């Protein structure tokens, strides 16, 4: 099973995160299947590859709670819902 989760980067007391698709059995800092975004909580900046995220979610990937909150604020779930209505 694949999860969308945060991978920590940055210095002490200055974290930044990459949003990655990774196998459930892998460690947080393990090798990612694909990097799909970036999140900086200090500046509240988010950069997402929305098309890739939607593809992973449609194939069964489960976002963690924090990533789910980030995706919800970016409107990704609304796009998925709109795509499913038009099909």
UniProtKB/Swiss-Prot annotation:
A family per Pfam: Ribosomal_S16
Keyword terms, alphabetized: Chloroplast, Plastid, Ribonucleoprotein, Ribosomal protein
UniProt GO cellular component terms: chloroplast; mitochondrion; small ribosomal subunit
Keyword Ribosomal protein (UniProt): yes
SUPFAM superfamilies on file: Ribosomal protein S16 (SSF54565)
Primary location class: plastid
UniProt subcellular location: Plastid, Chloroplast
Gene Ontology MF terms: structural constituent of ribosome
GO process annotations (BP): mitochondrial translation
Family per record: Belongs to the bacterial ribosomal protein bS16 family.
UniProt xrefs under HAMAP family: Ribosomal_bS16
Protein name per UniProt: Small ribosomal subunit protein bS16c
């Amino acid at each position: 099973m694949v999860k969308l989760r945060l991978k920590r980067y940055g210095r002490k007391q200055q974290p930044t995160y990459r949003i990655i698709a990774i196998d459930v059995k892998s460690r947080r800092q393990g090798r990612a299947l694909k990097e799909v975004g970036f999140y900086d909580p200090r500046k509240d900046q988010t950069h997402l590859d929305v098309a890739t995220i939607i593809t992973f979610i449609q194939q069964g990937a489960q976002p963690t709670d924090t990533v789910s909150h980030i995706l919800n604020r970016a409107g990704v779930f609304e796009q998925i819902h709109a795509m499913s209505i038009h099909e």
